[in-house]
Amino acid sequence: MEIAVIGNSEFILGFRLAGIRKTYAATDDERLHEHITSVLQDPEVGILVLNSTDMERLPRRLQSTLENSVRPTVIAIGGSEGDMSLREKIKRSVGVDLWK
């Protein structure tokens, strides 16, 4: 299972430096949508990391698909959703509340 990261070049740089190979630079909304569609179809990806501002720019239907996705589990970083959203996603993905 691999981690994929989609975002602007500044957002994905740290993930590249940490050794994540599947990083995709999205310079505009069209590229963002293309990369997300591609990653959702990749059976090797277990976690998809997005910038929360990119997530907010997506059409509501795609946002809903990503929010409800279990494989890959989609994590939006940097927004006001905070720990509760991440907690719920991990609980849904793993089946156990790791915070308890």
From Swiss-Prot:
Record membrane topology: Peripheral membrane protein
Disulfide topology: none
UniProt-listed Gene3D superfamilies: ATPase, V1 complex, subunit F
Example GO molecular function: proton-transporting ATP synthase activity, rotational mechanism
Annotated localization: Cell membrane
Keywords attached to this Swiss-Prot or TrEMBL record, sorted alphabetically, are:
ATP synthesis, Cell membrane, Hydrogen ion transport, Ion transport, Membrane, Transport
Q: Which GO terms describe its biological process?
A: proton motive force-driven plasma membrane ATP synthesis
Q: Respond yes or no to whether keyword Nucleotide-binding is given for this record.
A: no
Q: Is NAD a UniProt keyword of this protein?
A: no
Q: Name one GO cellular component term.
A: plasma membrane
List the HAMAP family.
Answer: ATP_synth_F_arch (MF_00312)
Q: Which family does it belong to?
A: Belongs to the V-ATPase F subunit family.
Q: Main role?
A: Component of the A-type ATP synthase that produces ATP from ADP in the presence of a proton gradient across the membrane.
Indicate the quaternary assembly. Has multiple subunits with at least A(3), B(3), C, D, E, F, H, I and proteolipid K(x).
Q: What is this protein called?
A: A-type ATP synthase subunit F
- Which organism is this protein's natural source? Methanosphaerula palustris (strain ATCC BAA-1556 / DSM 19958 / E1-9c)
